[in-house]
Amino acid sequence: MKNLIYITSVIFGFLYAQNELFIPETMSGNEFNLSLQNGTTQLFDGDATETMGANGGNLGPTLIFEQGEFVNINVTNNIGEETTIHWHGMHISPENDGGPHSVIMPGETWNPNFTVMDKACTMWYHPHLHEKTNEHVTKGITGFIIIRDDEEAALDLPRTYGVDDFPLNLQTKQFDATNQIVIGEHGDNVPMVNSTIDAFVEFPAQVVRLRVLNGSSMRVFNLGFSNNSTFYQIGSDGGLFLDPISMDRLLLAPAERAELLVDLSDMTGESIELKSYGSTLPQSAYGIAGLSTMQGVAPSGYNSNELNGNDFILLDINVGAQTDNPILTIPSLLVDVTPIDESEATLTRNLQITAPNMMQNSITGPFVFDGQSFDMNVINQTVQLGDTEIWEIFNMSMVAHPFHIHDVQFYILDRNGVIPPENERGRKDVVLVKNMETVRFIAKFEDHADDEVPYMYHCHMLQHEDEGLMGQFIVEGESVGIDNNITLPNDFVLFPAYPNPFNPTTTIRFKLVTSQQNASLRIYDISGRLVETLLNEKLIAGEHEIKWNGGNNPSGVYFISFETGEFFSNQKIILMK
């Protein structure tokens, strides 16, 4: 029987009482004032916990936006240090987006304003200051954004906030002996919902809508109910589906959102639990029983964390009486969804997630895109306004990464060439890329362009993001050509191997700018085992060419690892016999 972990507090043999689920207040209209501030919160009996919040000492209000409305927001920084606020998932201009360049100094007010262009969905806001995102989010500066539109309003759905429509921010955190939040370690063994430990809530005996956010820094949840009842996902990150999708488990990575309908109409007086089934998480997801492999050891504290590999309770649900005018049925249809056809793409971009070099720990990180750690002064990609692009994300590390891109909602095309499950076919801004997996998605970059202010793309495991697994792109308003990596390493260029796929020989070309530069070229297999060293010597400047004959190796995926000086690049090749 799979393990079930009950997270409780015990003193002198008595259990602390459960805590009623905190439901954030709402703000609506056209003018919004947010004060970011420090505070303390009584999360445990004993020492109060130092926290941060918006318009309070912990968490922030739920902002309700109407599609087509112009909103003006004043964000005042009262936490005593620099921060930012990012409107996660929203299609807005880069100067309003709230990325790491939009720093709010202590005591100052930032004033973003924009027209809400997104469809009805559940989004959220959080800090995005480079190297401080994890701390500021984990300490509590997060809040929901609910966007409404006419299409959603015409549907027979629950939408009375806090009555039959509930926001659920799921997190796990680590605390020290004095009940203070620990940042950047891996002992996150305390589940929380809306910053409530051992949370309980009463839902009415009818159809209830859950707006679920994985607000954790690192952990992937595998959600389901203790009675294994069917629930219905009606929307993902960027909007509603064509029709509800029935399921009994939902994988939710950090920063992903899901709108769920749960039919409790026959359960008056009963109780169930919302749980994470960590015992059945997919391989490489943060939260499995162990991450140690030949490529490295698990992060410190990970293997002793009792949540990892186990099932645990997030929320106790008591089913009470129906409300007036309850919703009692699950709708059969929702809204029109028109995915972007692959034929509309004019460009495919390829990004690889790796450790900085092949010999580093591919479990703990740090991790990088295309061999380069995040640099605020480097624009990694340039996109043309109006273009439709395919982005291909290949994860060469041994841990799954939730990839997030600002500005756009995308449609997942495939995972390792396989069409994604139904609930991943809607509008998305986060996708979990498992180890040794390639995910392709398609997006159209429209409406907003700025030659100077960039958008971000990054891993949404906040520790990885802070450590450098992030890049930035600008959207240009004029079609002047694609400039991939405006600031390139000036030591080398690694050209695409040709042919690829190949049998049995492929040609690898590279360029060195300076002479007497030591260059190494190695081939690894998919498990990270060194297959062959093709080059490890000093070379003169210019273009060089090396052929690799894989005839003595089995068919499969291999990786070219090229290093010179402090720079590193790699490339996937496929031997097909």
Where are these regions (language model features)?
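Short glycine/proline/serine/threonine-rich loop/turn segments at secondary-structure transition edges
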Residues: 120-124, 267-274, 447-456, 554-556
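C-terminal outer-membrane/trafficking sorting elements
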Residues: 5-7, 11, 484-498, 502-577
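Extracellular recognition modules
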Residues: 126, 275, 458-460, 559-563
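Active-site pocket scaffolds in enzymes
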Residues: 87-89, 95-100, 104, 233-245, ...
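Beta-strand signatures of extracellular beta-sandwich domains
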Residues: 84-86, 222-224, 402-404, 520-524
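Aromatic/hydrophobic beta-strand junction motif of beta-rich domains
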Residues: 73-75, 212, 393, 506-512, ...
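Histidine-centered copper-binding motifs that mark active-site loops
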Residues: 18-254, 260-261, 280-282, 291-355, ...
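Edge beta-strands of extracellular beta-sandwich domains
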Residues: 284-288, 471-473, 569-574
